[in-house]
């Protein structure tokens, strides 16, 4: 079965085609980062308008690269939420319209389920059960995954998501949007230990996170520190170390609490190399396994949507009616139906 996947939940336009026999055939991504850089963040109106401009050319490019025609597509999957409603509507309406025109079924896919299952596209995918750490610009969650579609929320951020904290701290340091990757880059030149940042909510029990206070701590530190490049690198290093330490402590607790022996990292922040290296070392020292997707499948993309759509089509477990275009800007992951596979 070949499924066309469409992703437009925020500011990246993604189109991909997944074949359940031959794997990922094509993965087209267009980033709007340059458009939003002047505003220091995503402007929803600009995002949706640019999705409209790019989505059809990307679909054409995907079909061309895969050497397929519309008649070769067996289903269309699109991101229905969570996300920006104006952006979601672009992908949803185009996806449903194509499915209607091509006389194939369409399916609404949960954006975070896409991220969570993106490592399944790798040569060595994880087996169940596992603990998933979902870290992105909008989410920071720990989830117990016992099978496809069966998710239990263990903990989440009570305020800012980790990716949001990265971007806001980067902005305080004068870095361009999106600042998270740039902060990580200058952190590599930072001197460890020059600044000591707190590890929020690690001294109390539980698996919830809080990053708003860490961002405030960074702001106060920046305000009283020198403004030279080395000082900024040292602050970036202290911030990143604090974030990574916090995530590691919570992941260890989640693994201990569930008794699972596998950790999956997903979402845009999971591409952070410092996080990957330190989490990998920690998990392997425990005698356990860690999994994550290649960097281009960590950020928003159509490949993860096409894959989840393929799995749900095959199981005949659909999360919504096929007769209407429905988007859900807020959509708890736990509401999804278990996939029988």
From Swiss-Prot:
Binding of Fe cation, residues: 111, 115, 300
Cofactor: Fe(2+)
GO cellular component annotations of the record: cytoplasm
UniProt-annotated location(s): Cytoplasm
Record keywords, A-Z: Acyltransferase, Cytoplasm, Iron, Metal-binding, Transferase, tRNA processing
EC nos: 2.3.1.234
Cofactor binding mode and count: Binds 1 Fe(2+) ion per subunit.
GO molecular function, one term: N(6)-L-threonylcarbamoyladenine synthase activity
One Pfam entry name: TsaD
Catalysed reaction equations from the record: L-threonylcarbamoyladenylate + adenosine(37) in tRNA = N(6)-L-threonylcarbamoyladenosine(37) in tRNA + AMP + H(+)
Domain of life: Bacteria
SUPFAM superfamilies in UniProt: Actin-like ATPase domain (SSF53067)
Function: Required for the formation of a threonylcarbamoyl group on adenosine at position 37 (t(6)A37) in tRNAs that read codons beginning with adenine. Is involved in the transfer of the threonylcarbamoyl moiety of threonylcarbamoyl-AMP (TC-AMP) to the N6 group of A37, together with TsaE and TsaB. TsaD likely plays a direct catalytic role in this reaction.
Name of this protein: tRNA N6-adenosine threonylcarbamoyltransferase
Organism in which the protein naturally occurs: Baumannia cicadellinicola subsp. Homalodisca coagulata
């Amino acid at each position: 079965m070949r499924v066309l996947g469409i992703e437009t939940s925020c500011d990246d336009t993604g189109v991909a085609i997944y074949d359940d026999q031959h794997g990922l055939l094509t993965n087209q991504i267009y980033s709007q980062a340059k458009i939003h850089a002047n505003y220091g963040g995503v402007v929803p109106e600009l995002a949706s308008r640019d999705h409209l401009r790019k989505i059809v050319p990307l679909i054409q490019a995907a079909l061309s690269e895969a050497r397929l025609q519309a008649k070769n597509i067996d289903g269309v999957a699109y991101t229905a939420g969570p996300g920006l409603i104006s952006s979601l509507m672009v992908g949803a309406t185009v996806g449903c319209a194509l499915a209607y025109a091509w006389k194939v079924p369409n399916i609404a896919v949960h954006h975070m389920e896409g991220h969570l299952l993106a490592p399944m596209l790798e040569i060595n995918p994880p087996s169940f059960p596992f603990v998933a750490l979902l870290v992105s610009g909008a989410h920071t969650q720990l989830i117990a995954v016992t099978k496809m579609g069966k998710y239990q929320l263990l903990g989440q951020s009570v305020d800012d998501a980790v990716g949001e904290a990265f971007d806001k701290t980067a902005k305080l340091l004068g870095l361009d949007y999106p600042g998270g990757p740039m902060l990580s880059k200058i952190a590599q030149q930072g001197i460890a230990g020059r600044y000591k940042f707190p590890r929020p909510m690690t001294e109390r029990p539980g698996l919830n996170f809080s990053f708003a206070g860490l961002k405030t701590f960074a702001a106060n530190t920046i305000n009283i520190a020198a403004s030279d490049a080395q000082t900024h690198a040292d602050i970036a290093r202290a911030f990143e170390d604090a974030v990574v330490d916090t995530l590691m402590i919570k992941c260890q607790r989640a693994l201990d609490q569930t008794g699972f022996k596998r950790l999956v990292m997903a979402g845009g922040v999971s591409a952070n190399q410092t996080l990957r290296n330190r989490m990998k070392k920690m998990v392997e020292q425990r005698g356990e396994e860690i999994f994550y997707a290649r960097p281009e499948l960590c950020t928003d993309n159509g490949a993860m949507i096409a894959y989840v759509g393929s799995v749900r089509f095959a199981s005949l477990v659909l999360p919504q009616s096929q007769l209407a275009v429905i988007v859900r800007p807020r959509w708890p992951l736990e509401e999804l139906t278990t996939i029988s596979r």
